[in-house]
Amino acid sequence: MTEQISAATLFLTTDYRMELHTIHTGLFKLDGGAMFGVVPKALWQKQIPADANNLCTWAMRSLLVEHENRLLLIDTGIGAKQSDKFFSHYHLHGDMSLKSELAKRGFGLEDITDVLLTHLHFDHVGGAVERRSDGVLEPTFPNAQYWSCERHWQWAMNPNPREKASFLSENLLPLETSGQLVFVPREDRWNRTAFDQRFPGLEIFFADGHTE
């Protein structure tokens, strides 16, 4: 099982003022059976209908957190650097992009101070790295620290065959070599952990697999 930082339980106190913005980064399609597993199709298709090929449409969203002079982006969407074949395979659509959605709120890529990656599947971390005009891959946010979990990072760098397609080295290696990657300290597995002193009141916990 994969280990990830659960973004679902990040905001646990209300003693500090934070402004939250939903950032839409596009839509894509995945097989409904693969996503819902043992849940019968008769149940899940009532909420998320599938097309003729059993594909369901999924939204990719990031969360932007404003606190004092810090801008924290939680997840980055699929990004724009992959091949047309890759995007066609996952039926990427929608006119939203990370850069344009941030610009609508008055922010540029250089304004982001922190990026928290809940886990390292390509639809969550792809936008963390961009491809320059000369083909070189580099972090999308030049002034940001990128936060992840060391144990999950090692898993993503050495995945099992079943998960290999979800972890792309081009999304990870440029962060590791840039010097911008930081690991969130992991304490007791089931205890909440303070994220960073610059975001007081912001806590996380570690979970195996996807969470709600």
Labelled PLM ranges:
Residues L12-T13, E19, T25-R105:
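Conserved beta-strand hairpin/beta-sheet module of binuclear metal-dependent hydrolase folds
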Residues V125-V136:
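Metal-dependent catalytic neighborhoods of phosphoester/phosphodiester hydrolases
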Residues V125-G127, F205-E212:
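Active-site glycine- and acidic-residue-rich loops that bind
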Residues Q4:
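Cationic, low-complexity basic patches in intrinsically disordered or flexible, solvent-exposed regions
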Residues H93-M96, E101-F107, D111-D123, T140-F206:
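Metallo-beta-lactamase
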Residues L72-I74, L116, Y146:
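Residue-level marker for buried hydrophobic side chains located in beta-strands
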Residues I48-N53, D134-G135, I204:
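Short, P/G- and charge-enriched loop/turn segments at secondary-structure junctions
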